[in-house]
Amino acid sequence: MREVNSNTVIKEVEQIVEKACSRDTNVFGYNIWTHHITQVVKIGKKIAGRFNADPEIVEIAALLHDYAGIKDHSLHKEHHMHGAIEGGKILKDLNYPEQKIEAVKHCIRNHRGSVPGKRGTPEAECLASADAIAHIEYVPSLFYLAYAKFDMNIDDGTDWIRKKLNRTYKKINPELRYLIDEKYKSAINLVAKKEAQL
């Protein structure tokens, strides 16, 4: 088997995921690419060193972590499982090394805050934290999902966003929470249940 160039693999995966994000069938809209996936990649690469994580694995896993739900919304509820399968197929087709494929799949399977998992590797810890930090850093994308894409009413949307932020914060590695504490508190305050105070 010929030697695979990791930069080529990353570029190919990037193109595949961005193309899926641009399709009309993607219920999240192209904004999931511009306001979430690319942000998870950037954050993941920035924090990889803190975990002694392989930045290549983190970057590829970040690109693919929501791919299954983007490609087919019926897979969204279990997108972490389907995404690992889909990601594995993509990487195998690109002749990516099997050991690295398994590492990427492990990250994808264990990135969600709403589903118990065993991160167990620096790369999986990094992806889960990067995904969570991106949600808190870019709260407007959650409002967009709740109201524009999922057509929720004000109360349901606010409740969904609040629960999402709470789950998200809990999945950030405790050693990194200080990086996002103020933004998290501000976001939670914005969606807190409260009466008008004027």
Residue ranges and their predicted role:
Residues 2-8, 26-52, 64, 115-198:
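Divalent metal-dependent phosphate-bond-processing catalytic cores, especially two-metal-ion Mg2+/Mn2+ enzymes
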Residues 55-74, 79-83, 103-113, 131:
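His-Asp-centered metal-binding catalytic motifs of divalent-metal-dependent phosphohydrolases/nucleases
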Residues 8-13, 53-61:
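Short coil-to-beta-strand
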